[in-house]
């Protein structure tokens, strides 16, 4: 868990992408 900082950035981007896709899917 030493690379938590870079991992968090990647997770944030992934979560944002999934969130946006989920919102679009839910709207449809």
Curated annotation (Swiss-Prot):
It comes from the Bacteria. This is Putative fruR/shl operon leader peptide. The gene is fruL. It comes from Escherichia coli (strain K12).
